[in-house]
Curated annotation (Swiss-Prot):
This is Uncharacterized tRNA/rRNA methyltransferase LasT. The keyword Methyltransferase applies. GO terms for biological process: tRNA nucleoside ribose methylation. GO terms for molecular function: protein homodimerization activity; RNA binding; RNA methyltransferase activity. GO terms for cellular component: cytosol. Gene3D superfamilies: 3.40.1280.10. The keyword Methyltransferase applies. InterPro entries: Alpha/beta_knot_MTases (IPR029028), RNA_MeTrfase_TrmJ/LasT (IPR004384), SpoU_MeTrfase (IPR001537), tRNA_m1G_MTases_N (IPR029026).
Length: 228
């Protein structure tokens, strides 16, 4: 499975360099940056010693949404208190979740927020699943480079697995299901129920391939009967 690392508005060049070095160490190579030019500072390469190829191939996007244009499944890092109605997974819990997704999706992204404020609510809404590192200390904080290393270490086995032959045909099922569900909620005049919409959108990301296909069939039957 291809896994892209996305850094949203990183402020410090050293943090980008540390993230690139962590990626290189664990076999990751695709780094994207949103709304920042800090990687152009010399300090990025000083810290990213031996990881110049990752720095050279960084792709920059103005918004997180644009950076996810070719991604099938998005995981965003945040504190548990920000999760609201989202499913919240530890790094360990992400492994079986993404292993299942790799059988019918080819490209996932792991998103890290700003050093001082993390991701906005609008950015978190773009994620299929939220994740965070459980901390014991009273001041639960990892710097950006440390956080990237934790996740790259945990997920390294996934990028070593060959792509499934049937992934291309099914990888857009989840996005299509989201759009179909929202259309149905609009038809039922409940699309303005924020709690319901948030709950539904985040739980859809947990569905396995068979469940996704079955829900498509259910929505099809509901749509057909509504229009009678």
């Amino acid at each position: 499975m291809r896994i892209t690392i996305i850094l949203v508005a990183p402020a410090r060049a050293e943090n980008i360099g540390a993230a690139a070095r962590a990626m290189k160490t664990m076999g990751f190579s695709d780094l994207r940056i949103v709304d920042s030019q800090a990687h152009l500072e010399p300090a990025t390469r000083w810290v990213a010693h031996g990881s110049g190829d990752i720095i050279d191939n960084i792709k920059v996007f103005p918004t997180l949404a644009e950076s996810l244009h070719d991604v099938d499944f998005t995981v965003a890092t945040t504190a548990r208190s920000r999760a609201k109605y989202h499913y919240y997974a530890t790094p360990v819990e992400l492994v079986p979740l993404l292993e299942e997704k790799s059988s019918w999706m080819s490209h996932a992204a792991l998103v890290f927020g700003r050093e001082d404020s993390g991701l906005t609510n609008e950015e978190l809404a773009l994620a299929d699943v939220l994740t965070g590192v459980p901390m014991v200390a009273d001041y639960p904080s990892l710097n950006l480079g440390q956080a990237v290393m934790v996740y790259c270490y945990q997920l390294a086995t996934l990028i070593q697995q060959p792509a499934k032959s049937d992934a291309t045909a099914d990888q857009h099922q989840l996005q299509a299901l989201r759009e179909r569900a929202m259309t149905l909620l609009t038809t039922l005049a409940v699309a303005d129920d924020i709690k319901l919409v948030d709950w539904l959108q985040q739980r859809l990301g947990l569905l396995e391939q068979r469940d996704t296909a079955m829900l498509h069939r259910l929505l099809h039957d509901i749509e057909k009967n509504i229009t009678k």
